[in-house]
Amino acid sequence: KQLDIEGIPPIYSIEENEDGLEIIEEYLACQTLSDILDEHTFSNLEAYQIIRQLCIILDVLHQQDPQIIHRDIKPENIFYDGKQVYLFDFDIARNYIENQKRDTTVLGSQGYAAPEQFGFYQTDIRSDIYSLGVLYHVLLTNKLPRDYDLQGIEKRIIDKMIAIDPQGRYQDVKE
């Protein structure tokens, strides 16, 4: 709620109700990437520009002390107005806790969540990089990585982003 980051709409309030916490964010009159993907895939350049903007947003989150890990990067949680992306839905975001062996709660969206989000290890900024790699693939193909192969530089970048072992991934979004 305290962050002022371009690409993250302001959070007006966080309210507790019978279902848990409800986050009230600014309304944006644009579509989610999921809605856009119902109509078409993105060109290599468009996909790159979207991923680049998300890297900038995530870099700011990951530079906080403690680091903020979104943990639910997927087309439904990203709005796009044709120029700017907006990252929403921080319901399962968490602060990184140093020296913790694994997360106590298994959360994330199937297909996009990193393997460590299913209780194997602690999530960290590389978990967001994994999800970002899946998203990059989906923007280009409209399919999850296991369903379709890419070629060229995009394939090499995405393969590194979605490595099963976090040590095999890019270690931060600046890479």
Enumerate the predicted regions with their spans.
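Catalytic-loop of the protein kinase fold
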Residues: 62-80
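Conserved activation segment of eukaryotic-like protein kinases, specifically the C-terminal portion
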Residues: 102-116
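AlphaC helix of the protein kinase catalytic domain
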Residues: 32-42
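Conserved short submotifs of the Hanks-type protein kinase catalytic core
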Residues: 18-32
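Activation-segment/catalytic-loop signature of the eukaryotic protein kinase fold
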Residues: 14
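Short, conserved alpha-helix in the C-lobe of eukaryotic-like protein kinase catalytic domains
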Residues: 131-141
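Conserved catalytic-loop aspartate of Hanks-type protein kinases
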Residues: 128
